[in-house]
UniProtKB/Swiss-Prot annotation:
Stretches with biased composition (Basic and acidic residues): 22-34
Composition bias, Polar residues: 1-20
Record gene name: SLO1
GO annotation, biological process: intracellular protein transport
Organism: Saccharomyces cerevisiae (strain ATCC 204508 / S288c)
Residues the record lists as Phosphoserine modifications: 10
A matching Pfam family: DUF2205
Protein name: SCOCO-like protein 1
N-acetylserine modified-residue sites: 2
Organism lineage string: Eukaryota, Fungi, Dikarya, Ascomycota, Saccharomycotina
Signal peptide start-end: none
Consequence when changing residue 72 to A: Disrupts interaction with ARL3
Domain of life: Eukaryota
Length: 85
């Protein structure tokens, strides 16, 4: 018997098929887990991006409303000064 045959425990020098299948299943499971994690991260990023866009729109709308109110209050203040003189 050669040293290779002794070290692997099989007469052909190859790993038994059950060990190969186990290794392939573990690799497949790791790949599947990584794919699920990647998809979850991508979905989370998409949700965060959409929420950011929504908040930017709300912020812009509030800024426009503030500008309008500033103009309105400024006009009221000017008109009240005219009446006092």
């Amino acid at each position: 018997m050669s040293a290779e045959n002794i070290s692997t425990g099989s007469p052909t020098g190859k790993q038994p098929s059950s060990e190969v299948n186990l290794g392939e299943r573990e690799a497949g499971t790791k790949n599947e887990r990584m794919m699920r994690q990647t998809k979850l991260l991508k979905d989370t990023l998409d949700l965060l991006w959409n929420k950011t866009l929504e908040q930017q729109e709300v912020c812009e709308q509030l800024k426009q409303e503030n500008d309008y109110l500033e103009d309105y209050i400024g006009n009221l203040m000017r008109s009240s000064n005219v009446l006092e003189k």
